[in-house]
From Swiss-Prot:
Its EC number is 2.1.1.77. The active site is at residue 64. It comes from Nitrobacter winogradskyi (strain ATCC 25391 / DSM 10237 / CIP 104748 / NCIMB 11846 / Nb-255). Gene3D superfamilies: Vaccinia Virus protein VP39 (3.40.50.150). Keywords: Cytoplasm, Methyltransferase, S-adenosyl-L-methionine, Transferase. One of its GO terms (cellular component) is cytoplasm. The keyword Lyase does not apply. It is an enzyme of class 2 (transferase). This is Protein-L-isoaspartate O-methyltransferase.
Length: 217
């Protein structure tokens, strides 16, 4: 019989799948291992929490596929002393992963229900270097300052200059870019002295990023 602290089979497969699909950054893998995805999914989806699939949450949004979470996180090359902006809090799962790898996360959510739930969940689980804001991801207030890294977790037809202007020198931004329906492409931007360096990564499918704060929900 395995020891009491032996990971359940589904979590072992979760970890193995990330490695098989090319996730190699040990800090990212540890964060994916330590953040309990089952605490961020809907009650009825707990049995599927460790499956490599996106799951629905409130307000018609989703908690992203674990591979995509790990991939986007790895591509940001996060450091312990960095400040990160996340657009699209959702359940707070990606937020929690980021918080284990940097100094501070500011995350913006347009749905009050999701923002309130994520804030309470993250506080309960002890992720204390996170600030959850109800707001418009297309219009970040000036007092928020600039960030070393920016992650967008909803599809944009183009990356607004208002976001790239928030990047510190040598900062990185990752976002799904493309039509609101169908597939998008993950784009990685780096702020270089001569301007933005753009790199196309993998095809993905995200819910659309919408401007403004939701009047309902």
């Amino acid at each position: 019989m395995p020891p009491a602290d032996h990971p359940p089979p589904e979590k072992m497969m979760f970890q193995l799948n990330l490695r098989r699909r090319g996730i190699s950054d040990q800090r990212v893998l540890r964060a994916m291992d330590n953040v309990p995805r089952d605490a961020f999914v809907e009650q009825g989806d707990r049995e599927d929490a460790w499956c490599d699939t996106a799951l629905g949450i409130a307000c018609g949004q989703t908690i992203s596929q674990p591979f995509v979470v790990a991939y986007m996180t790895e591509r940001l090359e996060l450091g312990d002393d960095q400040r990160v902006l996340e657009i699209g809090t959702g359940s707070g799962y990606q937020t929690a992963i980021l918080s284990r790898l940097c100094r501070e996360v500011v995350t913006v959510e347009r749905y009050r229900v999701l923002a309130d739930r994520a804030r309470a969940r993250l506080k309960h689980l002890g992720y204390d270097n996170v600030e959850v804001l109800l707001g418009d991801g297309f219009d970040i207030p000036g007092e928020a300052g600039r960030f070393d890294r920016i992650m967008v977790t909803a599809a944009m037809e183009q990356i607004p200059e208002a976001l790239t202007a928030r990047l510190e020198p040598d900062g990185l931004l990752i976002a799904p870019v493309g039509p609101q329906s169908g597939r998008q492409t993950l784009i990685l931007l780096r702020r270089a002295p001569a301007g933005m360096i753009r790199k196309e990564l993998i095809d993905v499918r995200f819910v659309p990023a919408l401007p403004g704060i939701a009047r309902e929900l």
